[in-house]
């Protein structure tokens, strides 16, 4: 038996109802504090005098045989229950009975545009004791309970029309902060080590800056054409390109025009410069010459991977390749594309088949694409790197690879992380092969018309700068190179001055005079290469079952030098008189 000393009770028949949880206390009254004791309706019998003027009245509470009626959505004592977590004192919010906690959570989720993820099987317990354990399941429970997202009005947060607008503080690094907030909302990223998360946020910030470009055109920057700026000038005077970076977009809105291909190639070159400059700041051990070497090494593979990855993201059409100017090129090129060599060697067809199709199957996320870009750029075997730069770049590349493996392991916990990570790295040989085709096409473009376009940036990466100097000092007049078929091979292939042009001959059928006139060495020059490209096949292309003659043979000691001849005409006339023996 439990006796409670209270002051007033409202009577209604033989039953009583508690009107309020608080009571007015009179002097001399003993107060008993009851913490959330469920009140039961019962038969009340007085055990003493019932005078209201007495000091206190004792009541004996006995359970009643009548079962309490509980309405749907309400508790036993008449209070409404939250449809989401089951907490008491719920009111109508966004179409359902909900407590203030779930109402505020639902509103913050929609107005803040958060993105949650469940660490388990999307079936977490959501009650008033564990409702903060999993935000994803709590938000799903709000939707299932019937909360209407359209009922949330963000404009209700404003306190009224402000006569003086509030000044918002400018963030130091807005892109980095956005990625930080987005990654903090993802539960998988919280499992990454701190250093790995920082590196990932840095790479994502670099990608955002490269894609957005800049539109702050100033009069100071318009004085110099960006195409006339060299790679060294880009790294040493960074403000020279401010306002020259157009925004990059891969949405296939229209088909690209042939005259756009050069502009697209130039924009991708600037993007490669920005990527290299930002990554080398993280490495903090690379000078300008090393940066130039990295740009030359990564331009083609980075461009191929960018086009392929964004094509797999933005379209399911298997017959188009998206470019960075909101345009695309089809698999079957129109006839006008034959006028340029940018897309020769079946580059589009092979890229769609060998790279875009596997990327669609892998369905890469942005957190996987960006580290792959960094791995492509950070090539420690790039030609021209110093030994110190190779070591620094190799260390940074190892960190990025380890970060990529951690990301794959957290993003795809159901599948084998090691096999997916291996499939990602197996894309690199295909990218290298396709980038070789692209480099060859760019070499031809620079050889055929690159000098006329005046784009020194692409000419520095794919053209031989010594070619122009040799052309000026050469005795051959420039009109000889107007025919594309007679352009020097030196501009599209490595120097061959140290190679020997040797032809297979049958010693038994050759006289000593023939051997002396043929000569084993043909010094390389621009004029000779041009005439060789015009249609003359050198003797080295002929074959014979006999072995090559020994270089130390006495018959080859008296070779003919190009300087001893009176011009290339006399030299080639002697070569044309020599018989060529075919097998």
From Swiss-Prot:
InterPro entries: HNF4-like_DBD, NHR-like_dom_sf, Nucl_hrmn_rcpt_lig-bd, Nuclear_hrmn_rcpt, Orphan_Nuclear_Rcpt, Znf_hrmn_rcpt, Znf_NHR/GATA
DNA-binding region: 79-154
Annotated keywords: DNA-binding, Metal-binding, Nucleus, Receptor, Transcription, Transcription regulation, Zinc, Zinc-finger
Any one of the GO BP annotations: response to osmotic stress
Coiled coil: none
SUPFAM superfamilies reported for this sequence: Glucocorticoid receptor-like (DNA-binding domain), Nuclear receptor ligand-binding domain
Zinc finger (NR C4-type): 82-102, 118-142
Location, primary (coarse class): nucleus
A Pfam family this chain is assigned to: zf-C4
Listed Low complexity bias regions: 46-58
Cellular component annotations (GO), alphabetically ordered: nucleus
A GO molecular-function annotation: RNA polymerase II cis-regulatory region sequence-specific DNA binding
Polar residues composition-biased segments: 66-77
Compartments (UniProt record): Nucleus
Function: Orphan nuclear receptor.
PANTHER family assigned: NUCLEAR HORMONE RECEPTOR FAMILY MEMBER NHR-31, NUCLEAR HORMONE RECEPTOR FAMILY MEMBER NHR-31-RELATED
Protein name per its UniProtKB record: Nuclear hormone receptor family member nhr-31
């Amino acid at each position: 038996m439990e006796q409670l000393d209270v002051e007033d009770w409202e009577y209604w028949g033989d039953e009583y109802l508690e009107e309020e949880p608080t009571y007015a206390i009179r002097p001399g009254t003993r107060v008993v504090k009851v913490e959330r004791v469920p009140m039961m309706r019962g038969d009340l019998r007085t055990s003493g005098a019932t005078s209201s003027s007495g000091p206190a009245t004792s009541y004996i509470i006995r359970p009643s045989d009548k079962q309490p009626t509980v309405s749907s959505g309400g508790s036993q004592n008449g209070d409404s229950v939250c449809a989401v977590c089951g907490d008491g004192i719920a009111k109508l919010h966004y179409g359902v009975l909900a407590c203030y906690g779930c109402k505020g959570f639902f509103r913050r989720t929609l107005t803040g545009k958060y993105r949650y993820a469940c660490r388990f099987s999307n079936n977490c317990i959501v009650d008033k004791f564990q409702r903060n354990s999993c935000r994803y399941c709590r938000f799903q429970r709000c939707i299932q309970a019937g909360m209407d997202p359209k009922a949330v009005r963000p404009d209700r947060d404003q306190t009224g029309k402000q006569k003086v607008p509030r000044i918002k503080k400018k963030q130091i690094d807005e892109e980095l902060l956005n990625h930080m907030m987005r990654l903090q909302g993802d539960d998988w990223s919280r499992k990454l080590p701190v250093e790995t998360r920082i590196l990932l946020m840095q790479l994502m910030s670099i990608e955002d800056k490269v894609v957005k470009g800049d539109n702050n055109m100033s009069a100071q920057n318009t004085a110099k054409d960006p195409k006339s700026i060299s790679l060294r000038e880009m790294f040493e005077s960074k403000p020279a390109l401010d306002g020259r970076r157009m925004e990059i977009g891969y949405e296939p809105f229209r088909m690209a025009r042939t005259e756009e291909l050069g502009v697209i190639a130039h924009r991708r070159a600037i993007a490669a410069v920005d990527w290299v400059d930002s990554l080398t700041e993280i490495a903090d051990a690379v000078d300008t010459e090393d940066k130039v070497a990295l740009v030359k090494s990564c331009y083609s593979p980075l461009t191929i991977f960018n086009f392929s990855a964004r094509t797999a993201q933005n379209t399911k059409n298997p017959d188009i390749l998206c470019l960075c100017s909101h345009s695309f090129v089809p698999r079957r090129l129109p006839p006008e594309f034959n006028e340029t060599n940018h897309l020769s060697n079946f580059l589009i067809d092979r890229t769609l088949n060998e790279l875009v199709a596997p990327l669609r199957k892998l369905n890469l996320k942005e957190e996987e694409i960006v580290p792959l870009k960094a791995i492509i750029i950070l090539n420690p075997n790039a030609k021209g790197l110093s030994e110190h730069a190779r070591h620094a770049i190799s260390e940074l590349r190892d960190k990025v690879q380890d970060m990529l493996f951690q990301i794959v392991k957290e993003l795809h916990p159901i599948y084998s992380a090691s096999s997916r990570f291996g499939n990602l790295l197996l894309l690199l040989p295909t990218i290298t092969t396709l980038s070789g085709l692209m480099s060859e096409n760019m070499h031809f473009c620079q050889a055929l018309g690159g000098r006329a376009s005046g784009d020194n940036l692409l000419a520095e990466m794919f053209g031989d700068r010594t070619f122009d100097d040799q052309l000026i000092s050469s005795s051959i007049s420039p009109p000889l190179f107007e025919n594309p078929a007679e352009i020097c091979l030196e501009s599209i292939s490595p120097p061959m001055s140290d190679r020997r042009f040797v032809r297979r001959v049958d010693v038994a059928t050759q006289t000593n005079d023939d051997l002396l006139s043929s000569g084993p060495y043909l010094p390389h020059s621009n004029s000779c290469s041009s005439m060789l490209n015009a249609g003359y096949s050198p003797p080295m292309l002929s074959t014979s079952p006999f072995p090559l003659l020994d270089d130390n043979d006495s018959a080859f000691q008296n070779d003919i030098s190009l300087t001893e001849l009176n011009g290339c005409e006399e030299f080639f006339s002697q070569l044309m008189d020599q018989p060529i023996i075919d097998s």
